[in-house]
UniProtKB/Swiss-Prot annotation:
Chain segments carrying region Disordered: 1-148, 197-529, 559-650
Family indicated by similarity: Belongs to the AIM21 family.
GO cellular component labels: actin cortical patch
Protein name, per record: Altered inheritance of mitochondria protein 21
Compositional bias ranges of the Polar residues kind: 1-10, 31-51, 63-74, 85-96, 242-254, 264-274, 282-296, 444-462, 578-588
InterPro entries in alphabetical order: Aim21
Alphabetized UniProt keyword annotations: Cytoplasm, Cytoskeleton
Record function comment: Involved in mitochondrial migration along actin filaments.
Length: 650
């Protein structure tokens, strides 16, 4: 007993801290409320925090009890020491109970809540907390018995929950095959959330094995000594270490609770019914455990059975992890059951350490090669270097057709202006018309030197080159335009003069409408150019007057001779002999005029004509009338008539 007390005093001195210093870690532990299940973990933490807080408060009261003048207060030092000794005795007893319960307690995810809250958060008052703290103040043997029952109940509850989650998982895997179950029984749970919860529960085997070892050592010590107080404190750990372990376990349990809440919200159909049933069972079991803690058993051997149960739970965890890994592979092989990670809600807790490890057998699983993917070199060697079935590699290289290069595209031609395009269209149309005309006409080979194809060359050049005397737009076969024939003059002089005056008075009409001069792009011309007066040029005309200058008149002239000529001829004797008394020439007798007679007639005619002309001139001067002169010129001499007249006169 004395040795144990010495060890407890040493541990107390290690735990104790200087007066006036507050331990915020213990204050944080004190602020953690107890779980509704009434487990001893929350009560242990609150008891330790209350003891430390009372100790610090007493120290502060002792220091502050001095008067403001610096004199000590009237409180005796003995009273303070007695109060401290009483508190230390209670603290030692509570510490022993806490140490033993922390070693014997199994892993229970209903034991604590999230410890990551802020320091300023106020603790929630719970009536169960006071009850558990009172229970912990009892002797150590009763506390061990009560804690053993609590851990046993928590272990059974954990086993039920694990079995329920595995059942849900199996149902979801079966529901992935639509041929086995109807569509009404399909599971819409978040499979990844359920599996991650199992992984987190089984992700700390080291902590569980350490607790089992501590329980074994405690069991062996109790069996050897027969009293809990005589158990050696070799395996005693610092309370802060135990608190850290509890924080870690509480973090995992809070993560598991969040996963279960996500499953409850996302599940539907049979999964919702199973989860509701499971939740009701857990609540009833927790309430029964809280009621049984008030009635502590009196058997000490339950501690050994608790260790054996923890071993069985550890073995069950390992089996479930194996089943979980197999189920994870099956789910990943079925792409229909895969759930997108982006759609799953973000979790505040950390992911397990082995979440990113590759699965076993994933290296052997390879997707089948597609048609467009290149074939590996090993496969090519096995197939004899034939990437295409039925043809060797060398034949493909030799027979591969070479793709000719595409010629460069010609640049698009520039668009001509409207005037140029109109001129080209007119020229083309004119050439077509000329070609059609030349085809109709057949060229004679005898008359022309050119024949056959050579003639077509000249015909095609007709519309391009102009010949002398051709107007623009004419072809060689066309006749040039002529002036209209002049109007015939009327018989009377007055009518001709009136028509000439009308033509001279008429002015030539303008060729076309005169357009207003415009500047570039329809702009107005400047003022000094637009205001210039236009000069109209008169068309010059040539007036022609026709006058009679001379004329020819043909008429008969009466014969005039001298008296000698006018004498009648004598009768010619029948014999025809000329007598000497009437000497006449033979010409007279024969009716032929003599030269002297002809000269006489000519002279008389000339004289008579000259007289007539003089008379005509005098008449014109008197009448003042412009008349052409008339000349009578004998064109021939009628000898026969003159002879006949002479005969008649004779």
């Amino acid at each position: 007993m004395q040795e144990t007390q010495d060890q407890l005093e040493q541990m107390k001195t290690m735990i104790s801290k200087p007066a006036g210093r507050k331990d915020y870690s213990l204050m944080q532990e004190e602020s953690v409320p107890s779980t509704p299940s009434g487990s001893t973990v929350g009560s242990l933490i609150t008891a330790v925090g209350q003891n430390e807080h009372n100790k610090v408060r007493n120290d502060e009261e002792a220091t502050s009890s001095a008067s403001p003048d610096g004199t000590p207060s009237t409180v005796d030092e003995g009273d303070v020491e007695e109060s401290n000794s009483d508190i230390s005795g209670v603290n030692e007893q509570n510490f022993e109970n806490e140490l033993e319960t922390s070693l014997a307690e199994g892993k229970s995810w209903h034991s604590a809540q999230d410890l990551n809250k802020s320091h300023t958060e106020e603790p929630i008052d719970d009536p169960n907390e006071d009850k558990m703290s009172e229970i912990n103040l009892e002797p150590s043997n009763k506390g061990i018995e009560k804690n053993a029952t609590v851990t046993e109940k928590s272990a059974t509850i954990l086993a039920k929950e694990l079995s329920a989650t595995t059942d849900v998982k199996k149902k979801c895997l079966r529901a992935a095959k639509p041929n086995e179950l109807p569509a009404e029984e399909y599971c819409n749970e978040d499979l990844k959330g359920a599996i991650s919860g199992l992984e987190r529960r089984t992700s700390k085997p080291d902590l569980e094995t350490n607790e089992i070892q501590d329980a074994k050592s405690l069991e062996s010590g109790i069996g050897s000594s027969g009293n809990v107080n005589e158990v050696p404190k070799q395996n005693a750990k610092h309370p802060m270490d135990s608190c850290q372990n509890l924080e870690q376990s509480a973090g995992t349990t809070s993560a598991e609770k969040e996963a279960i809440r996500a499953l409850e919200s996302q599940s539907s159909g049979t999964s919702q019914a199973s989860l509701a049933k499971h939740k009701s069972e857990t609540n009833t079991s927790i309430q029964s455990s809280t009621q049984e803690t008030a009635q502590a058993p009196t058997v000490y051997e339950e501690l050994g059975s608790e260790a054996e149960r923890s071993k069985s739970h550890a073995q069950a965890y390992k089996n479930q992890t194996d089943e979980k890994e197999m189920s994870g592979e099956i789910i990943k092989e079925n792409p229909e059951n895969a759930i997108d990670d982006a759609s799953s809600p973000s979790k505040e807790y950390d992911t397990p350490s082995f979440a990113g490890k590759p699965e076993e057998g994933s290296e052997n699983l390879k997707a089948p090669a597609k048609d467009g993917e290149p074939v590996d070199s090993e496969k090519k060697k096995k197939n004899g270097g034939t990437p295409i079935e039925g043809r060797p590699l060398q034949s493909l290289e030799g027979d591969a057709p070479q793709v000719p290069q595409r010629p460069n595209k010609r640049p698009p031609p520039k668009k001509p202006s409207s005037k140029i395009a109109a001129f080209q269209a007119m020229l083309k149309q004119q050439q077509l018309m000329d070609a059609s005309k030349t085809k109709d006409k057949q060229i004679d080979s005898g008359n022309s030197l050119l024949s056959g194809k050579r003639a077509n060359i000249t015909n095609n050049l007709n519309g391009i080159f102009g010949l002398p005397g051709m107007a623009p737009g004419m072809t060689p076969g066309m006749v040039p335009p002529q002036r209209p024939p002049a109007r015939q003059q009327t018989g009377s002089d007055g009518g001709s003069q009136s028509s000439e005056n009308q033509t001279s008075s008429q002015s030539a009409a303008p060729s076309g409408p005169q357009r207003r001069a415009r500047g570039p792009k329809g702009r107005k011309l400047p003022a000094h150019i637009a205001n210039v007066e236009k000069v109209e040029t008169s068309i010059k005309t040539n007036e022609i007057q026709v006058l009679k200058t001379w004329s020819l008149k043909f008429q008969k002239i009466s014969p005039t001779c001298s008296e000698k000529d006018s004498e009648p001829l004598k009768d010619i004797p029948e014999s025809g002999v000329v007598s000497p008394s009437n000497p006449k020439s033979m010409s007279e007798l024969n009716g032929v005029p003599v030269e002297s007679d002809v000269i006489c007639e000519r002279e008389t005619d000339i004289l008579q004509n000259s007289k007539n002309e003089m008379n005509d001139l005098e008449d014109t001067n008197e009448d003042n009338v412009k008349e052409p002169r008339q000349f009578s010129i004998p064109t021939h001499f009628d000898l026969g008539e003159s002879d006949a007249n002479q005969e008649e006169s004779s």
